[in-house]
Structures are given as C-alpha cells and as structure tokens.
Amino acid sequence: MKPRPPAPLESQHLPSETKGVPAWAPFTHRTFTIIWLATVVSNIGAWMYNVATGWLMVSLDANPLTVSMVQVSNTLPMFLFAIPAGALVDIINQRRFLIAGETAYTVASMAFAVLVWLHLMGPASLLILSFLVSVGSAFTAPAWQAIVTQLVPKPELQAAVAANSVGINISRAVGPALGGLLVVSFGLGAPFWINAVSNIGVVAALFWWRPPIKPVVPLPAESFSSGVRTGLRHARYNPYLAATLIRTIGFFFFASSYWALLPVVANRQIGGGAALYGVLLGAIGAAAVGTAFVLRGLKSRLGANWLVAVASVMTGVATALFAVAHGPLTAIAASLLAGASWIFAVSSLNVSAQVSLPDWVRGRGLAMYVTVMFGALTAGSALWGQLATSWGVPTALFIAGAGAVLAVPMTWRWKLQLGEQVDFSPSLQWPAPVTTHAVEPDRGPVLVTIEYKINPNEREAFLDALANASNG
C-alpha cells in the first residue's frame, strides 16, 4: 500500500481465482478503505516533501552531484535496511512493526520541518535528515507489501493490488504539483509540515486496525539472524527471483538518471522554478495513472518480458529528451514518456517478484527485491550526478539513455515469471515406510534399532557397559 517505494504489487496476472472480481470489491471492506485513504493522503504529503527537498538543495547548492545526493539519501536506506526489515516482517507482529516505523517517520519529518522553518538547514544537514526520514520508509516497505493479504480475501487480492497502485499513482500525479504550488505560494517550509501532519492519519489507522487472528503454530520462533540467512539463501537458489532481480537492475540503474537530475534540468537547463519542477514530477505521475488504464491489454498482448523491454527503450528516449530540453514543452513530453515507461516496468517486475516467492519467505524475498531496486537507484543516482558534474547534464543523460536501451539485449536471457506455472505448495508425496509386517493403527510390531560406532581400543569397555545397561 504505502509509501515511497514504487507500487508494491501491481498486475493483472495473479492466480486465476482472482479473475472476474470487480475493481471496487476491496472497498467493501472498511479496514481496507480506511487504510487506503490514509496512505493516499500520506503519499501526497510525501511527494510534496520530495519536491521541496530537491528544490531546497538547488537553492542551497546547485552543483549536479550535490543535487543528485538528495536522491541517494532518499534511496540508500532502502538498500541498507530492506533485508533486515523483511526478516523482521516474517518473524514479528506486522501491525506493531508498521506502527513503530511510521511513528519514527512522522517524528523525523517533524524535525525536518522545524529546521527548515528556523532556517537552520544546510546541504549536509539536509542530506542527513533526508536519510533519517527515509529509514522509516525502508523498515516499513516490506511490511506494507506483506499485509495486503490480511486486508482482503484472497480472491480479491488482484483488485486490492490494482486499487493500491491507483492510489499511489494518484498521489504521484497530485502531490508534486501541489508541492511546487506550495513552495511558490507559502515558501519552502510548507510542504515539510504537510508531509509530517499527513502521516499522522496512517499511524492512527494502524492503531485502529485489528488484523485477523492467525492460528497458533506450535513451533519455535525463527531468530533474526537465522531469518536473514534463510532469506538470502532462498534468493540465491530461486531462479525465478534471480531473473527478476537482474532485470530490475537493468531498468532502475539507468532510470535513476532523470530522477536524480530533474531539479537541475528544471532550474539550470530550462530556467524554471519550483512550480515547473513540480509540474514535471506531476506529469510523470499523471502518465502513470493514464497508462494504468491500458496496462491490462498491453500485458496480455506483449507479456511481462517484452513490456519491460519496451519500458527500457522508452526510458532511453525520455532521458534523451530531457538532455535536449530547453523549454517546458519538451521536458513535459519527456516526463509523460518516463511515467508511462516507469509503470510498465514496475508493474511487471513487482508481480514477478511476488509470484516467485512462497509465503513462508515472502517478506524476506520482497525485501531482497526492494534492496536490489533501491541499490540500483542509489548507485545510478550517484554515478549520473558525478558524470553531470564532470561532463555536463546533457552528456550524463545521453549516456544513461543509451545504457537503458543496451540493457535490453544484455538482460534478455533472464525471463520474468508471472507465476501461472510456479507451484510453491508443500509436497505431500513422501515415500511410504518399508515394513516387514502389516502395521495396524492400534497394534503391530515396532522395531527400533540403534547403531554405535566404537573405537576398537574401547570395545571391551563398551560391551561391559552395554551388558550392565541390559541387565539393569
């Protein structure tokens, strides 16, 4: 559901039992509706915050590398903490975990707003606080993905996922434009306060929510360190997840370029203000919302593998348009193309990750996917910022665009899995034990044998001890 990572689950290719469920079915469940509304409001505040942080850094230090570090500080926590967070999600109470993480996010956001309001924010403190705010998102992201099945019945899962995606894309379309308008009208501090206040509704909704009681399993709880090791081991030997991760790197590493450098493009290359920056981000979100209406048909015609390939080529074209944009219209066209390509890739990769995982390791597997995604975004943002500082913004964007196109043939051998033929249910086909006589349920011969391996030098002592035991 929530927040800052791309839509957690998004596709029309979930198991066949979800087919035919109305799109509005999840909203017949009060819990889903309340949490959905709270997260949409919070995500609008988060996108206002994203606009404000990028523009605040431009006003403090317009160096492309420094500006791109804002994107790095926002994505690095997800890379560092998603795997341990995923292990915790599979072990501890998910509701309490979300309450703690969202409360920490709210407190950090309020601290950010206070420092901006008091004019105490500099480039270094902005990056540090951006990192701390994003830590809350990093720890809660796997949990938000994992609780969807607790909010609606399984046949309605696909509709719930689609509703979540619509909510996230609505916030992406509305939030940046409102953020830019707030900066122009009320100053840079306003979006930070709204972001902090908007998340209070999420915390309240989580306190109110009472998840269904699960049957108690009489097994010892898995330890945190063991959970992390098990998740990493599963990811290593799951070929379906491995293919998803490789394709994820191939897309997000190059797509990170325009996210990292868009404030510089809007300010230095086009000569616009915060309002233009908000419009460009809003155009990306609006394109994602519009594309969602044709996504089902495109997936059925092209399939996930081709859809991600098309998304990579579209990203290359969009990045090249950003490189040559010297007016708002070209930049807006690039944003629309980038938004459509983003939703093509994210929808296919998210679902491929979901259906490639069994339930018992789902939180950790999704955390691995999130880690790889944000690792690619983090590394890419830093690289494109450095190249833009050394060779210029247009050159860096052209290189990123060419890389996005070349990534298609380089990663094509790894096919995405949409899960129709993947069965993760436990096998019950165990071989029957070999018996010398028929065994009745209430009687029958039972023979237990115990073998001992004894040092030949201690043979006599062992026989004496065995004789004493049998006589005792």
Cite the ranges covered by each PLM segment.
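C-terminal transmembrane bundle of multi-pass solute transporters/carriers
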Residues: K2-L9, V70, L80-I83, I91, ...
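Juxtamembrane intracellular "pre-TM" segments in multi-pass secondary transporters
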Residues: E10-T33, P212-I246
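Substrate-agnostic recognition of the 12-TM MFS/MFS-like secondary transporter fold
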Residues: T31-N50, Q71-V89, N93-A108, S125-V184, ...
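Small-residue hotspots at the loop-to-helix junctions and early N-terminal turns
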Residues: Y49-A52, L56, D61-Q71, A162, ...
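Transmembrane alpha-helix termini and helix-breaking/packing motifs in multi-pass membrane transporters
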Residues: G54-D61, F112-L118, V174-I194, V264, ...
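Helix-loop junctions on the cytosolic side of multi-pass membrane transporters
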Residues: A146, Q150, F192, A196-E222, ...
